Amino acid sequence: MSKVVIVAKIKIKEEFKDEILDELKELHKSTHDLDDGCIQYELHKDLEDTNSFTFIETWESAELLEAHMATAHFASFAKTIENKLDALEISKLEKLI
């Protein structure tokens, strides 16, 4: 079973920055506290764009990543961010070396 790496780039609309940043922090905490298979779940801020953030995640398997995406806390986050982002780009990766 291969580990899965996720890079999720989020650009928040200016007027929602504080609200969504709080939600990102809560999602980080809930994921670490509740989700099996989470090896890494780090939130980074962009040094050149104050409205942009990146999650770098590592999961033990694709199945455990899918389980995370089916949790109540992830569903709540997804609903909260609706229409509050300028951009969302998600890359699903597998480490080669």
Language-model region placement:
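A broad, low-specificity signal for short, low-complexity segments enriched in glycine/proline
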Residues: M1-V5, E14-E19, D49-T54, I90-K92
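Short, well-ordered beta-strand segments in beta-rich or mixed alpha/beta enzyme
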Residues: V4-I10, E42-M69
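Glycine-rich beta-strand-turn "strand-cap" elements at beta-sheet edges
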Residues: V5, E42-D49, A78-I97
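Short flexible/disordered coil segments
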Residues: E14, M69-A70, L96-I97
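An amphipathic, aromatic/His-enriched active-site/gating alpha helix that lines ligand/cofactor pockets
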Residues: E26, S30-C38, T58-S91
